[in-house]
């Protein structure tokens, strides 16, 4: 089941892309351009190209059949727009529809070769894939939370902590709210976990988490809090190029993935944060959430340490993808779940997309909760296993915690 989960998660990530920028000379090409009518124009200079296309999650999705281990299933992939060549070998495509306010990832395909946009310096990495980024903000829309505004900003630090379980120091990304450095106040702590193939940078780059926190706090919609972004790959020190492995290509197939070691070691992180930062070191002032594999980790950490977190958020959680026999932490789950709820957590929050390949396992888990009368909050969105949904879930979850 875990191999199937990894394969399906891989399909949700765009292909690796690269491009070179001409630093001197050549015509100026502007791309992307958000037009006054809400459409978006993409341009790519390739005078010798035969065919240029653009694809990304701003396009309507296409459904396609895939087969894995003899099982056929339908997955959603972004649609494709074909550019037309113009003057000077500049290819252009304008969406025939208004692009809704949101944050999107896209790439070009030049004669079948994937490329990032050389005229757009905003690039994200998801595992080993590079994509160009398009942000369409609008006042009053959710995407406005993803933009940088003239509000008090928190501080983002890269912090190393000693892990006795791993046997080496490991890196965290830590957000402290505006005013932390000049205050003597203590703060609640939210721990945010990434998905398979991700790392401690994923939520800050792809997820726009620090912008979301800055804006929600500035609006008075969230309490000032410390936020800790962990690295769930217990065999790794840190994100790619930030560890002793050097120039190693990122991969989803890492040792000790979803086999209990990370969850077992999680109290090390909490202890370190409580010792280094001015935290309110008690259950009611701690929250945890995560996407996909991070949702799997969130659930198992929550039920194995029921006195640690009052708030838990599961975003497209990879429920039931590991064999209970691989770790004692995954055994006696129903008993642990009952104990977790007996201790009256403040909130269990679940979010999933209607076409997410993990939708059914999340539905089955909710049925278990319902059958036992265990309370939770639930959000169902359009779309599948995508960052668009996970950003939505974070903006919904954060205002509910530490009330």
What are these regions (language model features)?
Residues 4-13:
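Sec-dependent N-terminal signal peptides
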Residues 15-19:
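Sec/Tat signal peptide C-region and signal peptidase I cleavage site
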Residues 5, 20-22, 135-140:
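Short, basic/low-complexity N-terminal boundary segments at the transition from targeting/disordered tails
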């Amino acid at each position: 089941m875990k191999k199937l989960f990894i394969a399906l998660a891989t399909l949700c990530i765009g292909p690796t892309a690269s491009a070179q920028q001409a630093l001197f000379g050549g015509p100026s090409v502007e791309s992307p351009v958000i037009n006054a009518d809400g459409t978006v124009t993409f341009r790519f200079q390739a005078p010798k190209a035969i065919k240029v296309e653009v694809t990304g999650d701003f396009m309507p999705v296409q459904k396609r059949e895939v087969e894995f281990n003899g099982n056929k299933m339908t997955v959603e992939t972004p649609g494709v727009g074909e550019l037309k060549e113009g003057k000077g070998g500049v290819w252009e495509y304008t969406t025939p529809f208004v692009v809704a306010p949101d944050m999107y990832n896209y790439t070009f395909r030049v004669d079948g070769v994937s490329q990032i946009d050389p005229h757009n310096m905003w690039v994200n990495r998801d595992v080993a894939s590079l994509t160009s980024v398009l942000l369409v903000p609008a006042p009053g829309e959710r995407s406005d939370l993803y933009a940088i505004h003239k509000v008090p900003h928190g501080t983002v630090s890269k912090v190393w902590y000693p892990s006795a379980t791993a046997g080496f120091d490991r890196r965290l990304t830590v957000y402290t709210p505006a005013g932390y450095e000049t205050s003597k106040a203590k703060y609640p702590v939210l721990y945010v976990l990434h998905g398979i193939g991700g790392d401690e940078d994923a939520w800050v780059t792809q997820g726009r988490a620090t912008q979301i926190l800055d804006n929600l706090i500035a609006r008075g919609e969230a309490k000032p809090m410390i936020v800790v972004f962990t690295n769930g790959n217990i065999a790794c020190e840190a994100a790619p190029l930030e560890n002793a492995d050097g120039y190693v290509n990122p991969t989803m197939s890492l040792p000790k993935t979803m086999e209990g070691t990370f969850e077992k070691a999680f109290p090390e992180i909490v202890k370190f944060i409580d010792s280094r930062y001015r935290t309110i070191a008690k259950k009611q002032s701690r929250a945890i959430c995560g996407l996909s594999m991070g949702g799997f980790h969130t659930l198992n950490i929550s039920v194995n340490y029921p006195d640690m977190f009052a708030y838990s958020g599961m975003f497209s959680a990879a429920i039931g993808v590991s064999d209970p026999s691989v770790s004692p932490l995954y055994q006696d789950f129903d008993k642990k779940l009952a104990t977790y709820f007996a201790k009256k957590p403040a909130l269990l929050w679940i979010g999933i997309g209607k076409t997410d390949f993990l939708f059914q396992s999340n539905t089955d888990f909710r049925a278990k909760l319902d059958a036992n009368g265990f309370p939770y909050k639930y959000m169902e969105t359009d779309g599948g296993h995508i960052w668009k949904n996970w950003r939505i879930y974070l903006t919904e979850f954060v205002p509910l915690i530490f009330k």
